[in-house]
Structure formats: C-alpha cells, structure tokens
C-alpha cells in the first residue's frame, strides 16, 4: 500500500480547504467574518427596529399564544405575579398528595412511602392552558425576580447533579423552564425583564440538552421534545427582542446561538441577515456567521478551527452538528485520497484535524465508516468508505466540555462569565 508521506499532509489540508487563501469548497463563496470577542453581557449598538418575527413556524409554541403583549390588543392590563416561591404552596400540597413529586424535589431522606415536598427544591411544573379555562390568579404566578431565581437554581443546583442521569435532568429542567416561559407570558412584564429571564432559561436549556448522550435518551428523555423546547425558547426570546426597543446587552450572543443551533438552515440565516447592520457587526454574531459560512462551504479545516475558539454556550448550541460535520470531512478525505492500492494518513492527523478526543475516538470514527486501520494510520482504499446509520457519538470534551474552564454553568447562564479566557482565535 502506498504511504501518504509527511510532505503530503499539506495536500490533505488543501483538499479540506485549509491552506490556500480565499479557497473554499468550490461552492458559491461568502464573505468571511473573522472578528471575535466576548459573548457575555456586552452592549452592541442596535436600531430601534429589531429583528422581525420569524417567518418560519416554530414547533408547538402553544404557550406563547397568549403572550406578554396581548393587553395592547385587548385593552386590558395583565396582572403581575405574587407567588414568592419556585412552586406555589397549593401545587406543592396537591402534587405531594397525589404522589407526583419528582425525586429531585423531595426532602432528603423522604423517598419512602410518603415523600414530602421540599419547598426549597420543588419547582412549578408545566401545565398546558386549557381552552375556556380562566387565567391563574396572581398568587399562582411567579414575578420576574422569582422566575430568574428559579432559573438560577436549576442551573446551579440541578443541572450538575451527579446522582441522576443527564437525560433525566434535561427532561426535568426542560419541563420546569417551559413553566417559567408560561408564567412570564401570563403577566404584564417589561420587555427588558422578560428578555433577561428568557435568556437565562434558554442558556440553561441549551447546556443541559448538550450533556445528554444518545444512549441515555431511551425512556428518560425524548430528544425530539427537547429540541422542540429549545426552538420554542428561541422563538419566545426573539419575539421579545422584536417587540421591544432595547438595548438588550446579550442580544447579539443569543442571535448567534440561534444561528449556531440551526446551522445550515436557510431560514435561520435569512432571519439573522435581516437584523440591523449594527447588531450583525457585533463579535458574537460575526463568529456565528463565520461558522455558518464554513459549514455551508464544506471548508472543514476552517470550520473545526472556528469551533475550537467558540465559548462554552456557543459550543453547546452547535454540538448537534459536529458529528455530521466530521462525517462530511471524512467522506471528502476518502473521495480525494482513495486509490486501489490505498493511501494512508496518520491517525493523530485525523484526531487533530477533526478535534476528536484521543486516538481511540479517531479509530472508532474510521472503523464506523468502513475504513481499514494499519497500526496508527488509516488506509483509504477505493470503495471501502461507507455510511450506515448516524455518525458515532463523541464525547466532545475538546469542543464543548472543557470550555467551562473552572467556571460554573450558573456563571455562564447569568452572564457572570465575562472574564473567562477564550480558547483562542482562528486564522
């Protein structure tokens, strides 16, 4: 078998669009955005006219049918919530009586025949509004400060629980955050306060969903439902941005998260490109646009360089697309390098190029696609490459998990991570 010598590594990088200046994948070229910066609470100049309501339909966003600003249409004023707790006392008592408490909500040591609700752990569950049913009284609605404290609790105390599977945590958190959005929509809340709550809720949801491994979703969590909840969170937040005049300090970051979560979507890109130019020029949105451009152009070398530089929350948003991008990159290498006798590349090149977590993950990826291994090299033989099923799940430590860098999820969610060191900038 022919050996793919060291001097030919540059050929592999050229094949993947990583060397020649201005070289893309042969598709239509898009302008490159290279400006990067912090994605925390940075105020970017914004126009009084914010983004339009998304033209594509958000899946199942039923709780927003009676949104915060229906008073402008009906002439009535919505009340403000008065409930001081994360869960109204009446609901706590009812669910305790009906034995419908989640194990994350019971008092320590109270998991026996009659578990007791812990007021400091019980969080209001989502209940779909029924047609013709009167609005809940203010005593059952949590005001914005309580809603924000609830989100902080979910991010700081629940999301990182090690005694419960990530799938169960994600299912619990997604339901409780859905109730947060519903409580918010039933009150006359100022847009700035609403945006603060919705941003924190969406950041928490993105993080807990990203931690769920595919093998954990059987029974404990429905991945489609979790994705729907994330899209509903984006829909609620972007409508809030569209209604208000701002400025919203984190809008650029969350518009960028929207694009990264929907990477490759024409509709999502159109929505972002319709934002005011001043907002699009903010570093977080420039970074997201650069990632989207590299993904569309199949410029895999640039894509994985950019992915390495993204902060933690942005990495959580894009994680779902990483496996697909790795598969496309490996397929392109196979098409370019496969010969009847076979050319080889070092596994450590594949590991670094695709930002994999170690040589074993590189072996697993190559073997899952039918490629032959020769010690620590992968052999590209014509006709061997195959794609069956989904790409193998990765651990994503390099591209996602390691980017908290000693900070907590609560820091990230509450925009208290401004001093987090960035992994670096891409060329």
From Swiss-Prot:
Phosphoserine modifications at: 425
Ranges of biased composition (kind: Pro residues): 134-143
Chain intervals for the UniProt region annotation (Disordered): 1-53, 101-143
Residue ranges annotated for the PCI domain, each copy included: 229-397
Name this polypeptide is given: SAC3 domain-containing protein 1
InterPro entries documented for this protein: PCI_dom, SAC3/GANP/THP3, SAC3/GANP/THP3_conserved
Top-rank taxon: Eukaryota
Gene Ontology BP, a term: regulation of immune response
Keywords of the record: Cell cycle, Cell division, Cytoplasm, Cytoskeleton, Mitosis, Phosphoprotein
Gene that this polypeptide is encoded by: Sac3d1
Species per Swiss-Prot/TrEMBL record: Mus musculus
């Amino acid at each position: 078998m022919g050996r793919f010598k060291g001097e030919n590594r540059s050929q592999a990088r050229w094949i993947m669009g990583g060397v020649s200046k201005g070289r893309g994948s042969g598709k239509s070229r898009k302008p490159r955005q290279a400006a990067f910066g912090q994605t925390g609470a940075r105020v970017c100049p914004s126009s009084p006219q914010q983004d339009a309501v998304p033209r594509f339909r958000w899946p199942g966003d039923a709780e927003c049918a009676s949104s915060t600003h229906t008073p402008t249409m009906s002439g009535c004023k919505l009340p403000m919530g008065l409930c001081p707790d994360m869960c109204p006392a009446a609901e706590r008592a009812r669910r305790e009586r009906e034995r419908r408490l989640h194990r994350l909500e019971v008092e320590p040591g109270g998991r026996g025949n009659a578990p007791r609700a812990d007021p400091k752990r019980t969080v209001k569950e989502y209940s779909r509004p029924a047609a013709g049913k009167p609005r809940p009284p203010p005593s059952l609605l949590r005001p914005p400060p309580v809603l924000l404290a609830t989100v902080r609790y979910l991010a700081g105390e629940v999301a990182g629980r090690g005694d419960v599977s990530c799938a169960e945590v994600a299912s619990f958190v997604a339901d409780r955050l859905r109730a947060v959005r519903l409580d918010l929509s039933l009150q006359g809340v100022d847009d700035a306060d609403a945006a603060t709550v919705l941003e924190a809720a969406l950041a928490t949801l993105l993080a807990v969903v990203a931690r769920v491994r595919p093998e954990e979703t059987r029974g404990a969590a429905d991945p489609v439902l979790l994705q729907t909840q994330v899209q509903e969170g984006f829909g609620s937040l972007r409508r809030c941005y569209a209604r208000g005049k701002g400025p919203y300090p984190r809008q650029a970051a969350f518009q960028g998260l929207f694009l990264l979560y929907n990477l490759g979507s024409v509709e999502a890109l159109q929505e972002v490109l319709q934002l005011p130019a001043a907002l699009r020029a903010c570093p977080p949105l420039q970074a997201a646009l650069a990632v989207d451009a590299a993904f569309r152009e199949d410029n895999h070398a640039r894509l994985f360089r950019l992915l390495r530089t993204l902060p933690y929350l942005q990495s959580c948003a894009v994680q779902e697309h990483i496996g697909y991008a790795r598969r496309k990159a490996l397929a392109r290498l196979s098409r370019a390098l496969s010969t009847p006798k076979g050319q080889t590349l070092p596994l450590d090149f594949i590991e670094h190029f695709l930002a994999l977590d170690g040589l074993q993950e590189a072996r697993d990826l190559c073997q899952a696609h039918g490629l032959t291994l020769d010690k620590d090299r992968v052999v590209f033989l014509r006709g061997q490459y195959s794609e069956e099923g989904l790409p193998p799940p990765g651990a994503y430590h390099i591209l996602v998990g390691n980017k908290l860098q000693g900070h907590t999820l609560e820091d990230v969610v509450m925009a208290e991570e401004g001093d987090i060191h960035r992994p670096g900038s891409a060329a």
